[in-house]
Amino acid sequence: MKKILYSILIFLLILLNFSTVCADDVDNEVDFEDTIEVTASNVSELPKTNSRRYIVYDRISKSMIIGKNEDVKSAMASTTKIMTTIVILEKADLNEKVTVSAKAGGTGGSRLGLKRGDKASVRDLLYGLMLRSGNDAAVALAEHVGGSVKEFAELMNEKAIELGLTNTHFVTPHGLDDANHYTTALEQWIMKLL
């Protein structure tokens, strides 16, 4: 069953990495309908971007072709839930029942609408975490596996160290802003490769 959930997680991550953007073609410099094949020799021909940080990588060799500020620490927001899911899948049984605490039920941001005393399986909460970006599900799962959000964040940091992520630090399971909760574009890419 964990293999199925891992497959769903990978599929969702792929979907989350693609955004559709529509805009009027003002200057006809680049036809975004065409696929741009990027190689080390034509990197300078890439369209200009206003992104503060990014990486372009070869998904076959799993190597970076070019990056911009790829090692600069910044907030990771809801992509935090990738590591939350990894730790939950390693530490919990999908059929375990979780009782929602007052803290989980009162978590802000995007929510499933869980309330104190609600009961749900780890599996159902993971679906809510990854499909609906449920911050309340993230806290409920963190408390269930780690005993508290703080202890669960330590499990996330241990996993990050195990993966060699030296510029990543977790404070929460959901990614709501905290100055000590950060990663880099490069290390975020590494997490997505799992």
Model-assigned labels for residue ranges:
Residues 2-23:
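Sec-dependent N-terminal signal peptides of Gram-positive bacterial secreted proteins and lipoproteins
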Residues 13, 191-192:
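Generic low-polarity alpha-helical segments
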Residues 23-186, 193:
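Active-site-adjacent loops and short helices of periplasmic peptidoglycan-processing enzymes
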